[in-house]
Design a protein with these regions (language model features):
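ATP-dependent carboxylate/acyl-activation modules
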Residues: 218-271
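Substrate-binding/catalytic subdomain of NAD(P)-dependent oxidoreductase enzymes
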Residues: 108, 122-230
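Conserved active-site and cofactor/substrate-binding residues in soluble primary-metabolism enzymes
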Residues: 2, 11, 50, 73, ...
């Protein structure tokens, strides 16, 4: 069928999976599905990072699930952990490597320096594109836009903050030089592009940002290589937790979507 509105309002359709991407008409269709009592599963980070608050409110009003595990860090179940397992945890900070393209590039540059070679950003980006880790136009990844959208979603889920992608400070990796990688290496650090969401202990304000950072070589995030992602959660009771795995790709994303479909179906069956 070409009638998407007919699908999301069809009484014989129990659950809707949105996979069309973008903001419109995805937003309109999800709202319509929720209003007709249907749970929705999506992997649309652009949508959630810009109009997520509206969609979460609509899901609450309808009493239906809006699940989006695949929108952040692919196959890593960080959304479920924040929403369920850590629901009672006073979280203080979430930080992580949430873009596989930039982590692949930085890993290769670091390896080149460690091996006594030259860490060339342009050549490494070309290699990432050849291997399929980077898009032909890599701007969204290498300038931090993609990680910024994911950080906005994390802020909303972890802290209940109404953060949109445009609010997130972002700085990418395109200006990182071989000498900076080498200096970090000599000092016992590695350079990683981090998404950081944290609550100020005194004011309660939430800050959300994406930028390259020098990570101590002994920190768990320093060992995250190539296109893998990792999210580090810090809380008052649990201290520190790290979630690690493939953050992108068809199979991890499909696994996350299918997991949400199963959860939504179980919840729908149980009323």
């Amino acid at each position: 069928t070409r009638d998407a509105h007919g699908v999301v309002t069809d009484p014989d359709v129990d659950l809707v999976v949105e996979a069309i991407g973008g903001i419109e008409p995805a937003r309109e269709l999800i709202l319509e599905a929720l209003q007709h009592g249907k749970p929705v599963v999506t992997a649309n980070k652009e949508l959630l990072a810009n109009v997520g608050a509206e969609l979460y409110a609509a899901a609450d009003a309808a009493g239906r699930d809006l699940l989006f595990e695949a929108a952040v860090a692919g196959g890593i179940p960080i959304m479920r952990a924040l929403r369920e397992s850590l629901h009672g945890e006073p979280i203080t900070r979430v930080l992580g490597i949430i873009n596989g393209t930039t982590n692949f590039i930085l890993t290769k540059m670091t390896d080149a320096v460690a091996g006594g070679g030259e860490a060339d950003y342009a050549a490494t980006l070309t290699e990432a594109q050849r291997l399929g880790y980077a898009e032909r136009d890599p701007t969204a990844d290498v300038e931090g836009f993609d990680a910024g959208a994911k950080a906005a979603i994390i802020a909303t889920v972890a802290f209940g903050a109404k953060v949109v992608a445009g609010d997130v400070y972002h700085e990418g990796i395109s200006r990182i030089t071989a000498s900076e990688i080498a200096i970090a290496h000599r000092l016992g650090y590695v350079v990683k592009l981090l998404g950081i969401v944290e609550r100020d202990a005194e004011s309660g304000d939430i800050s959300v940002r994406v930028h390259p950072a020098m990570v101590p070589i002994h920190h768990p995030l320093a060992s995250v290589r190539d296109s893998f992602n990792a999210v580090f959660v810090e809380g008052d009771f649990v201290d520190s937790l790290m979630f690690y795995g493939r953050g992108a790709g068809g199979a991890p994303t499909a696994s996350a979507v299918f997991g949400d479909v199963v959860d939504a179906a179980i919840n729908l069956r149980n009323g």
